[in-house]
Amino acid sequence: MPAKKLVLIVVDGMTPAAFERAADGRAPALAFLAAHGEYRRGTSVFPSLTPVCLSSIATGVGPGAHHIPHLVWWHRGERRIVEYGSSFSALRAAGIAQSITDTVYNMNGAHLSAQATTVYEALEDEGLVAAAVNITCYRGRTRHLPTIPWVTKAAFGPKRFFYYGLFESDATGAPMAVRNRAGGSTDLYAAAVGRWLVTRDGFDFLAYYLSDFDYASHAYGPDLAEDVALARTDAAVQAIIDAAGGGDAFLERYAVVLASDHGQTRVERGARLETPLAPFADEIVVTASNRAGQVYLLPRARVDTAELAARLDDEPAVEVTLRIEGDEAVARREREELRFRPHFDGWQTSGDLSILDHPDALARSWSALENPNAGDLLVSAAEGWEFADLGGRHHAGGGSHGSLVTGDSEVPLLTIGVSGDIGRITEITPAVRAHFGARVVAADAV
């Protein structure tokens, strides 16, 4: 018997607490799904930033294997900053044309590891039809031309591919008002496309990405975001349920995985990570955004990562730094260090484990450090702090994410009709592939 078709719903930035309150009745569509599924709190990756997290969801591997390290990073080979959209000011600082190219094309076409198979590639290699709506990690086998006449460069996505109105594999009539992001325009667009797809039963697998909750959470904080954006999120979920003929008909037709990519915590203060490292400005490149930062050593650097980490000991915005020394990772916090490395029965450690007293912190830190595009020193922000981006912007007074702390790292995970105990966002794609019986090859296990 063929596997039931599957919808993956990703609500950007929704915390477990927000989902749990929604499931108590504040959001009818989410409450309906919660009543019919298995729910648990799961764990994101580090840095808990959208490009990194969505790449982990789409590939089923951590950043050490998929190679997307952050929202903003230093490209060692091309000797330039890559900026995926921390803010408009950051895009302008990095170069708008290059940043748009990096975000729309290069993240999938050049930066995402060719060895990390996406869920769309894996399923369509089995003869299934995959669809993606607005998700920024979209790499597939099908060539798509942009909808804008003067933009001619193609992107490769799944057979049914919808990307903020710029790429549309099918004419759906869905409106896309980029300038009304605060009014929920991206989720309205997703809902219109999702309704069109479900009405036609036009896929075997759908990645349905809803981003407006995160936008509201950055602006107002994770708690007030529920008042601003929860109804919009719920309406977008209700749209695809109604398109199937109602809740029972929807679940008769589709299995469901619902998750967030990361959590969100309240931010009260902003800091520039570059400031305490200013004496080494000609030896390093600092890239920071939200609640995670990176420091890259230039070839001429005389300073080492241990000295840089010690320099950050007294910075209130910094909770922990991470670096590699030999075959070990070193986490440093308030002059204390923890050394760790993978071992055949788990982890070999030396030092105070409380330095990384966060969800799945050893594995998440190791994967981040293994990323060939990551900085030589990684920095996780302290509670209540955020690092200003290239344009000097931060979300003080609102919400943010990116660090190792629990609030940034925990996500809601709900499954309906999908086997397996999914506890991490990296386990979503393996579960989806298993659901459809898609084979796994050696390269997928990196």
Language model segments and positions:
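Extreme N-terminal starter segment of soluble prokaryotic enzymes
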Residues: 2-6
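Metal-dependent active-site segment of extracytoplasmic phospho-/sulfohydrolases and closely related
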Residues: 7-8, 29, 232-273, 378, ...
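A structural signal for short, well-ordered beta-strand segments and their strand-loop junctions
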Residues: 10, 41-42, 129-135, 205-209, ...
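Active-site metal-binding loops of divalent metal-dependent hydrolases
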Residues: 13, 260-264, 383
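His/Asp/Glu-rich, glycine-adjacent segments
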Residues: 61-220, 339-355, 374, 388, ...
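Active-site neighborhoods of enzymes that stabilize oxyanions during catalysis
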Residues: 115-116, 286-429
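Active-site-proximal segments of metal-dependent phosphoesterases and phosphodiesterases across multiple
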Residues: 219-234
